[in-house]
């Protein structure tokens, strides 16, 4: 798949939070402008859509708050005892299924309620599978998840 005639990576994830993420918002760069946010509401029907992760309060910062989210609802920045943390790095470090989460204090535990699975960029495997079940072709599915990109034969590129 290409964007402006250039071969590009096409990221995928298991299950979005109902909308995929915009590359420019995530990477703050025009180079990833080809990754457009699209609705993938069918993902919300998956049995794996919501996931709870419980972590003992003792191992977390005393103050932990979401500072910023992107347009798809994924946490991009958190404040941890006054320090700014990047959302996706926090997700990976804490073993969360998604950076689209809410934080709840429950007794001596902190509950992270996560929507979706993975980074949420590009192709949703669950959403793509559901589109295929509805007789959409591979080309139609890729065009849906990568609307600004073009499918080209490799011989056309090189």
Positions of predicted regions on the chain:
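Conserved, single-site charged/polar hotspot
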Residues: 1-158
């Amino acid at each position: 798949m290409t964007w402006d005639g250039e071969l590009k990576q096409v990221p995928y994830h298991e299950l979005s939070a109902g909308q995929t993420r915009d590359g420019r918002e995530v990477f703050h760069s025009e180079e990833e402008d080809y990754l457009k946010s699209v609705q993938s509401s069918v993902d919300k029907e998956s049995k794996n859509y919501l996931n709870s992760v419980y972590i003992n309060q003792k191992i977390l910062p005393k103050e932990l708050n979401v500072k910023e989210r992107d347009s798809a609802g994924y946490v991009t920045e958190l404040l941890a005892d006054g320090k700014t943390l990047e959302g996706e790095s926090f997700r990976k470090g804490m073993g969360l299924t998604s950076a689209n989460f809410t934080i709840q204090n429950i007794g001596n535990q902190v509950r992270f309620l996560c929507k979706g699975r993975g980074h949420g960029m590009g192709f949703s495997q669950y959403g793509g599978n559901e589109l295929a079940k509805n007789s959409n072709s591979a080309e139609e599915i890729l065009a849906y998840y990568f609307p600004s990109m073009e499918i080209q034969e490799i011989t056309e590129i090189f």
